[in-house]
Amino acid sequence: METKDLIVIGGGINGAGIAADAAGRGLSVLMLEAQDLACATSSASSKLIHGGLRYLEHYEFRLVSEALAEREVLLKMAPHIAFPMRFRLPHRPHLRPAWMIRIGLFMYDHLGKRTSLPGSTGLRFGANSVLKPEIKRGFEYSDCWVDDARLVLANAQMVVRKGGEVLTRTRATSARRENGLWIVEAEDIDTGKKYSWQARGLVNATGPWVKQFFDDGMHLPSPYGIRLIKGSHIVVPRVHTQKQAYILQNEDKRIVFVIPWMDEFSIIGTTDVEYKGDPKAVKIEESEINYLLKVYNTHFKKQLSRDDIVWTYSGVRPLCDDESDSPQAITRDYTLDIHDENGKAPLLSVFGGKLTTYRKLAEHALEKLTPYYQGIGPAWTKESVLPGGAIEGDRDDYAARLRRRYPFLTESLARHYARTYGSNSELLLGNAGAISDLGEDFGHEFYEAELKYLVDHEWVRRADDALWRRTKQGMWLNAEQQSRVSQWLVEYTKQKLSLAS
């Protein structure tokens, strides 16, 4: 039976971040994901790297400070999938007085180290504003946007780059301690093939399933309760042509974002609803759709109805149960629990956390694990660049350089590759000399060469992996085109298997 230094269960942002950090410190690492990378919470976020302006109202100063500092780190680590964005906050004096917002924004500007992002300013909305005429004043500040699912993917690629192993569609069925080691058993969810490994340490980073894995997988008591809070978003054709996002204050004191997305759409979200069901079956309720439309329509001249919605998505945030009364008051901070057996076989479990602070969470996790591993390397991720991030400049400059190297690329295709794969685009394109070299076009310039790259280098096994997580081509491809992608994947996987055997 093979022995690993560390097995990480869960292929969301926290699992991938911890596995990458550990592999880079010289540990032999295996990460197991039961379905697909980022298939739950980590692909259903608002897609922001943000300090969390509203968390200041809940006195979450440590979390906000850490998150603010991390924005700049992540912009350098993944410049192909993360970029700065300005946020406009319309002033509604009956909800929060201007002095309170100014103090909040002053703290936001100064709590974290800010080197590249511009500070906050006041705004006057004139006759040409996209907002209703009664909204005359507001504020503007900086945060960042990120492709959440691809941030997870880049960390998984880093695990492999640093000598670790990543298995998707491989469900950990049990883990138990034996003679100072963990015995971990798993099965391939497609073939039923069984695996087992020994490990010197184990990480439970299963997100919404963290407590369930204690109960069913390890038969151990969970140190904390978990509260599942559902967040839903609606996607509509782009509601304005400005580059800025809007952050709207609602009557219930919550905030809702309106974020420009992929040049053609706006994301509106999120909700905060207690959730009791299966995290895999989460979907938006009619009441959430009405809530988001109402908040949006209260602010904007251009009105939206149910018919304008082109897509919706929902996810559950697995938050550490701090017995708060309302979903929005529960801390978004993370809790790391570690316990061992006579100084051996540590189990580190992750409760809570958010996309923005995943790298610090991983660093803290490794600090807790370090005493169990002699000769483990030091922290290293802060100065690292994630796979795809070596674009030397911004994404649009890189897209222009791609077109010079591959003149047959259309502007839109070069931009898609630059903003999706970054410096890995050249691996995808290889020696292609004409558009015909990219193979079949499944629709919306989604070529065979890209799908092949996704299977060979990004763990894609099903159409959804490719169309909704590694890319968002599902927004454009119709049912027939998506079915053709599925068919191609079946044929290509068969071909790969027969070559392997």
Which positions does each model-derived feature cover?
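Dinucleotide-binding Rossmann-like beta1-alpha1 core, especially the glycine-rich loop
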Residues: 47-128
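Glycine-rich FAD pyrophosphate-binding loop
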Residues: 23-44
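Flavin (primarily FAD) binding-site architecture
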Residues: 204-219
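A conserved short coil-to-beta-strand element within the FAD-binding core of flavoproteins
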Residues: 168-182
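Beta1/beta-strand and adjacent pyrophosphate-binding region of the FAD-binding site
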Residues: 2-14
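C-terminal catalytic lobe of FAD-dependent flavoproteins
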Residues: 142, 148-150, 158, 218-241, ...
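Core beta-strand elements of the Rossmann-like FAD/NAD(P) dinucleotide-binding domain
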Residues: 2-4, 191-201
